[in-house]
Amino acid sequence: MDDTFLLSNIVPQDLDNNGDFWNRTEMYCRDLTKKFSDVRVISGPLWLPLDDDDKITMDNANGIIQQPKMLSNGRPCKPHKTVSYPVIGKNEVAVPTHLYKVVMAEDQSLEKPILSAFIVPNQPISKDKTLIDFQVPLSYLESKVGLRFHSRLDRDSVNDLCSIDGCSLMRYRDFQAFFIHRGIKNARNKNELERYWRQAKRYDLSSEDEIKKVYESRYAELQENTSNAESH
């Protein structure tokens, strides 16, 4: 696990994506380890092309008018694919356009190994999107990455992970409640506690029994700690 925090083993990621959809995807992968004895997850970056038509649509959506390139005879060029991505830092580190995951699970309860592959745009993802929306055939992902995953695996002896397990991510509201509950429970002082409580109100979670209960409990603990400190 420590290797995942090495700078040589990470890529630049959209902040909203990292804190929301990708985070919920990783939580789903961790939950798989509670269901199956052997879970293997491979993640990585992708730089995928867009058709000229796609770029024109995207530019127009942003209010920018972009005309197709023209030939010398006045006819428009045939659309072609290009890869476009930003770079960051003084070393101009390339920011991937997409991220991928290959998730495989094995267990005695399964007739065959189960596996699914996903390609997720490195950008904010709509709250109504599901993980299955980004599922792709493993062969398609391999053609884009240039690698063959689980090369010794008999592809005919594998079932689809999402068909067996559902690939259901935690709902966005439950996701927010999870982190706010944890933040309130571990708040180190009243200021930190109140900050999480304001978040609970903002997401309309302050009336949830578990959130309210842990807030009142932690508030009493911090109040007692303050009183004990003042008495010494």
Regions found by a protein language model. Name each.
Residues 1-196, 202, 226-232:
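Domain-level detector of nuclease and nuclease-like folds
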